[in-house]
């Protein structure tokens, strides 16, 4: 099946707009230390990036509306400092995690799994080039030092009490690196890292 250049361009523009709007929502929530979206709300919202849709227009419109509503809510809320942890990935499939922390007055914000950073730029002639460039900028697909450095920046920027990671002991690709990165974060930032030894997909071992 051939896809026209105009269709490719339209799809790319829609995707970029969605990504930028979602990043704006996440940053807004992070700056309020999770007082706009709870950990489970954040996880559900970010699951859009893991979902396939036949038509992105309704999704984009819903995300745009959410951004407007959250900005309005922020204007009306009385701000106060909250205890929060920056999280590798708030586990959407085990909502008990966020609920337990919330019960102790700790908000979960983040997530590192969706962060990107500035990588070396290459010529982007086609849609495939653009997608490849985007993949190269995914933080968790790069080296440990880069991931730890970016996390440290956010711990300071959002005035977090520490970093919450783990939850992927069942995954050799993701889980195998987490303890090394956790040590780097503690060494570089001085922030405590809390490590949950559990299965991201299964709450039975909480």
Where are these regions (language model features)?
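A charged, amphipathic alpha-helical module
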Residues: 1-120
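Short, flexible active-site loops
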Residues: 81-84, 130-138
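Short acidic-aromatic active-site loops that bind/stabilize oxyanions
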Residues: 141
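Detector for methionine-enriched segments
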Residues: 1, 22, 77, 134-136, ...
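Hydrophobic alpha/beta core scaffold segments
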Residues: 100-112, 124-130, 137, 145-206
């Amino acid at each position: 099946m051939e896809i026209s250049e105009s269709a490719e361009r339209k799809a790319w523009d829609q995707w970029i707009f969605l990504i930028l709007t979602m990043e704006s929502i996440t940053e807004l929530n992070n700056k309020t230390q999770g007082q706009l979206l709870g950990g489970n709300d954040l996880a559900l919202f970010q699951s859009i990036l893991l979902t396939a849709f036949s038509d992105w227009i309704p999704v984009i419109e819903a995300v745009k509306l959410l951004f407007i509503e959250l900005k309005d809510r922020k204007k009306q809320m009385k701000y106060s400092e909250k205890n929060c942890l920056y999280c590798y990935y708030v586990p959407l499939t085990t909502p008990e995690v966020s609920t337990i922390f919330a019960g102790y007055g700790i908000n979960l914000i983040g997530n590192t799994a969706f962060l990107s950073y500035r990588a070396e730029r290459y010529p982007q002639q086609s849609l495939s080039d653009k997608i490849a460039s985007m993949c190269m900028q995914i933080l968790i697909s790069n080296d440990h030092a880069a991931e730890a450095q970016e996390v440290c920046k956010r711990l300071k920027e959002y005035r977090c009490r520490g970093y919450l990671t783990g939850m992927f002991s069942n995954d050799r690709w993701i889980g195998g690196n987490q303890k090394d990165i956790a040590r780097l974060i503690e060494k570089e930032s001085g922030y405590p890292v809390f490590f949950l030894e559990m299965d991201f997909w299964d709450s039975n071992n909480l």
